[in-house]
Amino acid sequence: MDEGFHYYHIFIDGAMFNDPGTENFYGSTRQESGIEIPAHDQAFYEERDVPHGNVQEVRFWSKSTNKLRRAFVYTPPTYNKDTKKKYPVLYLQHGWGENEYAWTVQGHANLIMDNLIAEGKIEPFIIVMTYGMTNEGFRPGGGAGAARPAGGARPAAGAAPAGGARPAGPAPAGAPAGGARPAGGAQAARPAGGMGMMLNNGFETVLCDELVPYIDANFRTIAKKESRAMAGLSMGGMETHSITLARPELFGSYGLLSGGTYNADELAGREKPKLIFMSCGSKENPDGVNKAGVDLRAAGYNAVSYVSEGTAHEFLTWRRSLYQMAQLLFKK
């Protein structure tokens, strides 16, 4: 098998089952079996004997959805040592069919950060991860208080179906050819209204008008756009594209991980972001990502294109992308 994290299931007499011998992960809006194939470059996301940060669950009231919502907040190892120090913040979004567990469970975002900080490759910053949709009638992983599955398996963001209907229209540059595909994995039925609800302004309101103020009020953040970034994988990248264009006063750096590209025309007439990071796997649509970077740099933008060699629409692509992007964010 290819390196990295993969979902799978077993068919017995035509029926699909999870493997009872492995841990389940949340993907395709349901629990899936998952397997980790060692990668030649896995040291950057391994658990190592270095100082570790903290991932805590927070609940914030959302007036727009009339409910208590959940987010996970990564704070670096230094956060509780110097109680006067303030930090930049990255808002990091999952893909379709996933939930707010995705980036720390499958993505190992906290371990990537811990290792980068220990090696002195980045200045520490906070990461905030929340559920990226407002379709509360069909919420992957259940509501904010959903129980974890039996046997200790953690509900984790997973991949949306590789099969099934895709959203109409051409694939964004950097997304798989043939249409913008949900974060890739095993086949499952798509819920009504799932992908079609992803780019509504409901989540924009939750993120920009409710979660960002909550984080700034309850954590030691540098509460200005130059110290605030938004990025996401697959659908989360598409949300990032939409929200950063709609709310340029909030975010100073943008990251699209297998989630399309920006172009100079749509960015014209506004202050240039500090960083535009665009990535995908070499088995996706790398030509579009590379061209977008060239075009944006020619137009005067600080744009970086990254292609993960030998990977597709999968978590090894996104782990590598976060590793690369984190080293470019919030540079003085």
PLM-predicted stretches and their roles:
Residues 1-332:
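Non-catalytic cap/lid and distal C-terminal segments of serine-dependent acyl enzymes
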